[in-house]
């Protein structure tokens, strides 16, 4: 015999799977980290319905232009969840956003995050937001607000997803981009720290699936003694702070390309006008003039990827590409070195149709 539920029994939000008290604990756990990212323009603190940021500093610009961006971390999060390591994916989130607006020459001003979880756990959220705060400190933007959403019945309890939103500013006469690029310009690359935050569906398929956590934490000779877990979760390099400092120091950079999903092939072309190509020197059998991170080679070999497919999937060791006048290469390289970067020449600009081509000569 079946019985119906007591129609007089109270069913709370907690009964439905949403823990308001845990949400309050999570907010308390992140306040200190968020406070470390503040800027003078921030008005008020956490807890308001909206976040206020003074525009007074923009008065010194000739024509201030706001630049916005949004992104996520993708399926790299599934590996973080598998390994129960949550302290670096927030840094990835910030990197993916701020380094998408710096190619216009924009300074990131403030950042907001969206954290969706199956079941809210204050400690895990604190780790995630701690990473976001670290990324904001590195890029110089303020973490002014965000949203934590608990999705019981929609997401598994241990699952979460992240989205980030950044707003920056650039003076209109100083906007960088394809219209400044000319034939004969040189392409400089800045090293990546590894896979960064793109290509992880392939990484998981060929290098992660079927392995235990213990196996993933074992040192591998192919990775120079590093474990696969450490290699694939290494945080994405944040270039914004150093590049903006270089621009303020007078580095005459014409255009930039953030090398993310689609690799060099599908990103460097975004810095080109329609009548020019970017010729990248892959160096033939000897390989390029820069270092390809071992983890990228490891995954590419596991997937039997052709060279062309590698260059349209992974960053291949280039996290950011810059286009500069041939006569300015040495000066720009020196300024970049002063900011801690190790720039290298990776190609040149030639007549074409707005695409990336490869020179594979030895």
Predicted ranges, named:
Residues 2-41:
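N-terminal amphipathic/basic leader segments beginning at the initiator methionine
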Residues 3-4, 8-15, 124-142, 155-162, ...:
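Glycine-/charge-enriched secondary-structure boundary and capping motifs
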Residues 19, 71, 184, 258, ...:
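Residue-level signature of catalytic and energy-coupling elements of molecular machines
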Residues 27, 126-129, 200:
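Hydrophobic face of alpha-helices
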Residues 30, 52, 97-98, 203-206, ...:
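Buried hydrophobic packing segments
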Residues 32-193, 279:
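Glycine-rich phosphate/pyrophosphate-binding loop regions near the starts of catalytic domains
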Residues 58, 72-73, 167-171, 193-195, ...:
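Short, glycine-/Ser/Thr-/acidic-enriched flexible segments
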Residues 70, 161, 174-228, 265:
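Short, acidic (Asp/Glu-rich) active-site segment that either coordinates a divalent metal cofactor
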